[in-house]
Amino acid sequence: MRTLRRLKFMSSPSLSDLGKREPGAAGADERGTQQRRACANATWNSIHNGVIAVFQRKGLPDQELFILNEGVRQLLKTELGSFFTEYLQNQLLTKGMVILRDKIRFYEGQKLLDSLAETWDFFFSDVLPTLQAIFYPVQGKEPSVRQLALLHFRNTITLSVKLEDALARSHACVPPAIAQMLLVLQGVHESRGVTEDYLRLETLIQKVVSPYLGTYGLYSNEGPCTHSCILEKRFLRRSRSGDILAKNPVVRSKSYNTPLLNPVAEHEAEGTASGGTSIRRHSVSEMTSCPEPQGFVDTPDQGPSGTFRSSPSPHSGPCPSRLYPPAHSPEQGPDHGSPPTSSPETLVDQILESVDSDSEGIFIDFGRGSRSSVSDFEAAGGRPSVV
């Protein structure tokens, strides 16, 4: 029993002992906290000085980028890491942009355009990559360091100088860097969506880029167009041809109930006088075609061999729905006074116009074979099938 009581009193310290130990422990914790804060402040100061030196065109010494990276990593692990974004915006970026703006703040006209273009080149080529390298451990958080830097450049420099007045001058020469700056800045959005500052930026872009598709429609030199994009007239050969192509013509018959070709009827022709051979013929009734212009068309001529002879067909008028020009007829030569060959563009226009003017439909004429080809085929003793 005495042993148990002794162990009990030894294991549980008295209140007086707790009171004696508390001031020493609290003091040690406080000293540790102060040391950590002092170290964090020193790290903040080194990062601040390094970033400001970049904006002042002083650059970073050797191995300084590695030291700043390690400092950012250490800060993110402390309780100050949660305030990193606020500190970056309110302290580092704001001071840096003011340094860049003060050099061009009171410029106007062409001098402002040239100075702003040079400032943008320096910021976009040197400052922005260096900031992304220094704060590389912060990647993955939104908004990113790149977005924050570009937004501060837009609000502190681009929208605060007299850029709109400089662009409105009649003989203003806009450097390419100005157009690049505006287009890069218009690709950065805030979490709140479209803001008043973003709309002000779009008004500047309209003076440099035309046509420009903005938040509220398409803008061009002629004025705003709130509908879809418009193709320039020079890209359309002719409006009439475009309308014809848009109609999408198809091959159709005179009536939707009557097909273009009636069913084919087969019959055996009687044997010829020479060899008694029979030829299978296919007859087509009510096939619509166009008359040949001063040409030759195949017409049936019942002979002893059951073949078709070529005979001239009288000209009964032009056919508007022909799919080939009459000037290229094989029977017409240069002595017949035919017009010269048209250009491909004019030829296509004539075909499209004839297609559009034909209310009955498009009919294809296959009867353009020449007399010599038929005669040679008969002499070869072939077995033609006639349609």
From Swiss-Prot:
Reported function: Associated subunit of mTORC2, which regulates cell growth and survival in response to hormonal signals. mTORC2 is activated by growth factors, but, in contrast to mTORC1, seems to be nutrient-insensitive. mTORC2 seems to function upstream of Rho GTPases to regulate the actin cytoskeleton, probably by activating one or more Rho-type guanine nucleotide exchange factors. PRR5 plays an important role in regulation of PDGFRB expression and in modulation of platelet-derived growth factor signaling. May act as a tumor suppressor in breast cancer.
GO cellular-component term (any): TORC2 complex
Phosphoserine found at: 253, 373
Keywords: Cell cycle, Phosphoprotein, Tumor suppressor
Protein name: Proline-rich protein 5
The keyword Transmembrane appears for this protein: no
Biased composition (Basic and acidic residues): 18-33
Domain of life from the UniProt record: Eukaryota
A Gene Ontology biological process term: phosphatidylinositol 3-kinase/protein kinase B signal transduction
Compositional bias annotation for Low complexity: 310-321
Pfam families: HbrB
Spans annotated as Disordered: 11-33, 262-347, 365-387
Region listing for Interaction with RICTOR, in residue ranges: 10-96, 189-219
Annotated source species: Rattus norvegicus
Assembly information from the UniProt record: Associated component of the mechanistic target of rapamycin complex 2 (mTORC2). Binds directly to MTOR and RICTOR within the TORC2 complex.
Family indicated by similarity: Belongs to the PROTOR family.
